[in-house]
């Protein structure tokens, strides 16, 4: 049985991780487009 605390931590980390990856990709995309144009 999964502990509620552990479950809460996992459910809290997943969106943060996805948002972090999205921000990193967005920054890299902006930097690349800025260098091109």
UniProtKB/Swiss-Prot annotation:
Gene Ontology cellular component? cytochrome b6f complex; plasma membrane-derived thylakoid membrane
Coarse class of the protein's main subcellular location:
membrane
How would you describe this protein's topology in the membrane?
Single-pass membrane protein
Q: Which GO terms describe its biological process?
A: cytochrome complex assembly; photosynthesis
Q: Could you state a single Gene Ontology molecular function term?
A: electron transporter, transferring electrons within cytochrome b6/f complex of photosystem II activity
* Top-rank taxon, per record: Bacteria
Pfam families named among the record's database cross-references: PetG
Keywords of the record, alphabetical order, are: Electron transport, Membrane, Photosynthesis, Thylakoid, Transmembrane, Transmembrane helix, Transport
TM stretches of this protein: 5-25
Q: Outline what the protein does.
A: Component of the cytochrome b6-f complex, which mediates electron transfer between photosystem II (PSII) and photosystem I (PSI), cyclic electron flow around PSI, and state transitions. PetG is required for either the stability or assembly of the cytochrome b6-f complex.
Give the protein family: Belongs to the PetG family.
> What is the protein name given in its UniProt record?
Cytochrome b6-f complex subunit 5
Organism, scientific name: Synechococcus sp. (strain CC9311)
């Amino acid at each position: 049985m999964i502990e509620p605390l552990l479950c809460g931590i996992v459910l809290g980390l997943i969106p943060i991780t996805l948002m972090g990856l999205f921000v990193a990709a967005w920054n890299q995309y902006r930097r690349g487009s800025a260098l091109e144009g």
